[in-house]
Structure formats: structure tokens, C-alpha cells
Amino acid sequence: MLNAKRQFDKNEDCGILFGSQISDERIRINSISDSCCDKTSALKCSCHLDAEKANKLIAEEFNKSNQTRVYIGEWHTHPEDYPSPSTQDLKSLKESYNKNQLAIPYFILMAIIGRKSICFKMYDGHVFSSIKPSITSNNK
């Protein structure tokens, strides 16, 4: 899903991560949105969500999934092979945590998509953590 969003010779892009809680310790990323980027402000090293478009996509995904898929965070691209979050990325993640009503409380996720790898960061209201997601099939 996220690999298809890699940035090669263009501006950064961004969108929404949708997921569901499958246990106290596990969150599943069910799907990702198409771009929700405000194209008028996108640069090679910067992008901003179009809040109106993002909110519309969040509502559509929630309704389409019989209220099981919710906003769990955001994805964006970086023009580098092995991405790491910038100071602005961490500030943005913290702001999103503080201003959004989170359906799954106490965390928000950010996926930073580089050309060769993806960096996942989580914020729990106090600490930023790197996470390594595990990939499972739908049959388990």
C-alpha cells in the first residue's frame, strides 16, 4: 500500500492512515487514503493536508467500513532513501494528537515514506516512539 506512494522527482505528498483496534496491544492499518495534500502548498520537502478533503475521506472510510475503520494517523513522503522525521514532522504529529478527536485513544501514528524504506513513528501524548509493524495476511 504505502510503497506505491514513494516520492521520485516530485513534491511531497500526504494522506490518511485508517485502522482498527484488534486487541489492547494491536492496531491494524486497514487502508490508506489517496492524496489529501493541499497541492497549492506542496514543495519538494514540505506538504500540508487539505483538512476539508481529509475530513471527507475519514467520514467516507468510516461509513464504508460499517464504522470499523477510523483515523489512526497520517502518511507523507520524503525525498530521501531512508527517511527520518524532521522537527516539523514531530511538531505536526504532536499537534494532530492534541487537536484531533482520536477514535482509538492514547496514540497517533505517522508513516514517512522514503524511496527505499518507511519510517513509522507513534506519539502517545508524552513520548515519540519508533515502531516496526508486523505484516500479517487477512487469513490469520
What are these regions (language model features)?
Residues 1-71, 79-140:
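Conserved beta-strand-loop surface patch within small alpha/beta domains used
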